[in-house]
């Protein structure tokens, strides 16, 4: 979770909101792009039936990207009926171990890009394209 926090807060104009029970949400211009979800009846442990307490939500660019992530062989990403037709994927915190630091950063950046103002996103992309070339 520390790396998620670092990556999210490195994005321009991002703020971190923390719920009363300590769950972080990352927001850019009032728009949520990633969060630690509270227990919900739509996300339950398949073995115990208990509501999951360790679910992260990441926005994605579109439903095509969502489908690609859901088809990932590692089985890290999932969804629930609540998110049908919505460009977001879910992931359990223990499954962060299955993705490396760069992939997590990319997930956060892509989520942020879906919610950031176009001007801010364009500037960020230009700055980072120059650094990598």
Regions found by a protein language model. Give the residues of each.
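Charge-dense, helix-prone N-terminal extensions
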Residues: 1-133
């Amino acid at each position: 979770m520390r790396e998620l926090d670092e990556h999210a807060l490195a994005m321009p104009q991002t703020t971190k909101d923390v719920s009363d029970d300590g769950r972080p949400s990352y927001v850019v211009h009032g728009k949520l792009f990633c969060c630690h979800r509270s227990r919900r009846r739509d996300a339950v442990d398949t073995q115990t039936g208990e509501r999951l307490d360790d679910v992260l939500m990441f926005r994605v660019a579109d439903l095509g990207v969502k489908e690609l992530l859901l088809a990932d062989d590692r089985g890290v990403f999932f969804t629930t009926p609540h998110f049908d037709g919505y460009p977001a994927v879910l992931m359990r915190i223990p499954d962060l171990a299955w993705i490396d630091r760069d992939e997590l950063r990319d997930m956060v950046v892509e989520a942020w890009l879906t919610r950031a103002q176009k001007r801010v996103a364009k500037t960020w992309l230009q700055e980072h394209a120059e650094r990598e070339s």
